[in-house]
């Protein structure tokens, strides 16, 4: 599967907060790291403080954990 920057992808890592959610590929690292694909999402995860806008809206994934949306 050829994933490129800007592509819409669905997350297939079951333990991920964003499992089965669709995000946009922000960057792809070609240096050989374990999780080279950075995916950006519209919503943030649960790590933000209560009552404050915040949280994380990006995460790294392996290509095998993604499918085209």
Swiss-Prot record:
Keywords: Membrane, Photosynthesis, Photosystem I, Thylakoid. Pfam families: PSI_PsaE. It comes from the Bacteria. The keyword Thylakoid applies. The keyword Thylakoid applies. Disulfide bonds: none annotated. It is found in: Cellular thylakoid membrane. GO terms for cellular component: photosystem I reaction center; plasma membrane-derived thylakoid membrane. It is a peripheral membrane protein. GO terms for biological process: photosynthesis. NCBIfam families: PRK02749.1. Belongs to the PsaE family. PANTHER family: PHOTOSYSTEM I REACTION CENTER SUBUNIT IV A, CHLOROPLASTIC-RELATED, PHOTOSYSTEM I SUBUNIT IV. Stabilizes the interaction between PsaC and the PSI core, assists the docking of the ferredoxin to PSI and interacts with ferredoxin-NADP oxidoreductase. This is Photosystem I reaction center subunit IV. The gene is psaE.
